[in-house]
């Protein structure tokens, strides 16, 4: 999966993630308690399809099926193109 451009946008360090959490709230993380799996860019509170794709890939790599499923559900609601091409949304609903 291509997520290179997300690498530049993602809040990577813990202080960046805390600022993003205080500014945007729980919606920008798939695991807000630990500030894991950010899905919004640093300077925006809008959910990014690239962030959802990166979170989905990382959750699959680390064997976290609940997080991967949550990323897919949010991506389907956001109408991300990568979910429609592979037919993920039909399998979820």
PLM regions with names:
Residues 1-93:
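Extended terminal accessory/targeting regions
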